[in-house]
Design a protein with these regions (language model features):
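N-terminal targeting signals for export/organelle localization
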Residues: 2-10, 17-73
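C-terminal cap of thioredoxin/glutaredoxin-like
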Residues: 30-34, 176-244
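Soluble non-cytosolic domains of exported or imported proteins
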Residues: 32-36, 47, 103-106, 133-137, ...
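Surface-exposed patches in mature extracellular/periplasmic domains of secreted proteins
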Residues: 50-58, 154-158, 184-188
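A short beta-strand-turn-helix
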Residues: 75-92
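Envelope-exposed proteins and targeting segments
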Residues: 90-93, 120, 219
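Structural alpha/beta surface segment adjacent to cysteine/selenocysteine redox centers
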Residues: 95, 100, 106-180, 186, ...
Length: 244
């Protein structure tokens, strides 16, 4: 978002460019002294018309916020690289930002699964956001590599139900348990696609002002923190009703 001083500067510059580019004056018709005089006229006008200046700045801010919002949610809706659970064709999408070392995320796991079981028309998009430690990053890379073998859900569930330190040894053991091809897994962990997916999620989290996990986005609603089953189903119903 623009600061007030930046907006003031932007307004002044916009007025100057407007006059410079208008057909009223020939191209390059201002000399240095005229430009200084013109800047002084603008400064005086701004000082004498603070309400009008505020109105213009408010409009600029509103448009900037709208553009930011639209671009962010457009970016969010492009989730082709993210894992999906629930109904892939669901009429309501729940985005969950989580970290595998987040205790609240693990507590919320059963809540989310139960909600998906009760509401069969909800699509869950899982946004890997490893922000707590290096083991969080490693776990996310393993999980997204498991997606390439169509075993993300199984591997994700294993990690979410695990209590303890997520060492690589533990992650490889889980990979074996769910039937992953270990050699392919090792290769896929190095893929640029996985790096880009996680980087995009971090950018999205920043744009959405998400600073912790778990966080949910349902419709245009951003919900920080864990939800109980009733709360989650209530948000889903609310968004569904708004969309109908």
């Amino acid at each position: 978002m623009f600061s007030f001083k930046r907006n003031l500067w932007f307004l002044t510059l916009s007025l100057f460019v407007l006059f410079q580019s208008s057909n009223v004056f020939p191209q390059n018709s201002f000399n240095e002294n005229q430009i200084k005089d013109f800047e002084k006229i603008i400064e005086n006008w701004i000082e004498k018309n603070p309400k009008k200046v505020k109105q213009v700045l408010d409009k600029l801010l509103a448009q900037e916020e709208k553009n930011h919002h639209n671009k962010t949610f457009e970016m969010l809706s492009d989730h082709s690289m993210d894992p999906v659970m629930g109904n892939p064709e669901g009429d309501v999408i729940v985005y969950e930002f989580f970290d595998y070392n987040c205790g609240y995320c693990k507590s919320a796991f059963n809540t989310v699964i139960k909600a998906l079981d009760k509401d069969k028309n909800t699509k869950l998009v899982l946004k890997e956001l490893p922000i707590l430690s290096q083991t969080s990053i490693n776990a996310s890379f393993f999980a997204l590599a498991a997606k390439k073998q169509n075993l993300y859900s199984e591997f994700h569930t294993k990690i979410m139900l695990f209590r303890g330190r997520l060492t690589d040894e533990i992650l490889f053991r889980m990979a074996n348990q769910v039937g992953l091809d270990i050699e392919k897994l090792k290769k896929d962990i190095q893929s640029d696609e996985i790096k880009l997916t996680i980087e995009k999620n971090k950018i999205l989290a920043e744009r959405l002002n998400i600073t912790g996990t778990p966080s949910f986005v349902i419709g245009n609603i951003i919900i920080p923190g864990a939800l109980n089953e009733e709360q989650l189903l209530k948000y889903i119903k609310k968004v569904r009703n708004e969309n109908s």
